[in-house]
Amino acid sequence: MTRVEELLSQIKNLKTEKNAIILGHNYMEYSVQLVSDFTGDSYDLAVKAMKTNAKIILFAGVYFMAEQASALNPNKKVLSPDPNAGCTLSDSLDVKTLQEYKEKYPNAPVVLYINTSIYAKALADYIVTSSTAVKVVQKLNADTILFGPDANLANYVQQKVPNKKIIKVPPNGRCIVHANYTKQLVELARKKYPNALLMAHPEAPLEILESADFVGSTNQMIQFSKENKNEEFIVATEIGMINALKIKNPSKKFYPLVTTEACACARCPYMNMINLEKVKRSLEEEVYEVKVPEDIAERVKRAFENTMKLL
């Protein structure tokens, strides 16, 4: 038995013993996705967390995702295998900056991407994902909207909803992975894989999205590649997504826009901090518990409910 097989077996036993479930983000490494009870994007997993009867929820993803699960599930124990697994997007917007924008634009609703710290989310009117951002903004009864922290997603929403003024909060919030994508990389990938369709995440720069055959969230990419007759796809998002796509569509071929050999930017260093050893320890010792203050959790839940009413 290999070490990976041993860990998978031990984690499976721990889940039963502790009445725990593992929620694994689509960007997780292959072995972590295998041991997860549910895989998906951050919103999908937050909803799954609300529906589970498990006593313990282990979130195999970056820290803001565990915060989100805790806010929506105050009576359950939520664990993060590594509390240092941060997010450049989440870190790019602090409460002070958001409050300054709210004071400057008092009548503008605040729409925050789910990749935001829980304390900033507590000041939001709506919390969206890459798959719901356009739909929510379209339905808002406001001409000016504060949108953050992802500037690329804000640009995409602005393009899709030109009749509204999107103010980026902050002006330069970026994902460390998607920020490095260029049109030149797209041209090289298309030349290398001429029969492949390009799928891009809305966190990518607008020039990448305009070159893509499909733009969508990680879950939407899985669905698109499953339903599309094409057999090959170039994937313009974090390289761990290739694992999720191969698990769900084993007969098709998926190529990352950029490989880890070509650029360190292909892999999110924070997502990469979560591995089987840490997952096992987290379940075994029930660390590290993520607990969101009650008043913050209530405000975040209210913003989520506001969003759900529009979808």
Swiss-Prot record:
GO molecular function: 4 iron, 4 sulfur cluster binding; metal ion binding; quinolinate synthetase A activity
Keyword field contains 4Fe-4S: yes
GO biological process: 'de novo' NAD biosynthetic process from L-aspartate
Location relative to the cell: Cytoplasm
EC number from the UniProt entry: 2.5.1.72
Cofactor(s) of this protein: [4Fe-4S] cluster
Keyword set, alphabetical order: 4Fe-4S, Cytoplasm, Iron, Iron-sulfur, Metal-binding, Pyridine nucleotide biosynthesis, Transferase
Pathway: Cofactor biosynthesis; NAD(+) biosynthesis; quinolinate from iminoaspartate: step 1/1
Family of the protein in this entry: Belongs to the quinolinate synthase family. Type 2 subfamily.
Residue numbers binding iminosuccinate: 25, 42, 113-115, 130, 201-203, 218
Pfam name, any one: NadA
Presence of the UniProt keyword Iron in the record: yes
Assigned GO CC terms: cytoplasm
Cofactor remark from the record: Binds 1 [4Fe-4S] cluster per subunit.
Catalytic activity field: iminosuccinate + dihydroxyacetone phosphate = quinolinate + phosphate + 2 H2O + H(+)
Annotated organism of origin: Saccharolobus solfataricus (strain ATCC 35092 / DSM 1617 / JCM 11322 / P2) (Sulfolobus solfataricus)
Principal subcellular localisation of the protein: cytoplasm
Residues engaged in binding [4Fe-4S] cluster: 87, 175, 268
Protein name from the UniProt record: Quinolinate synthase
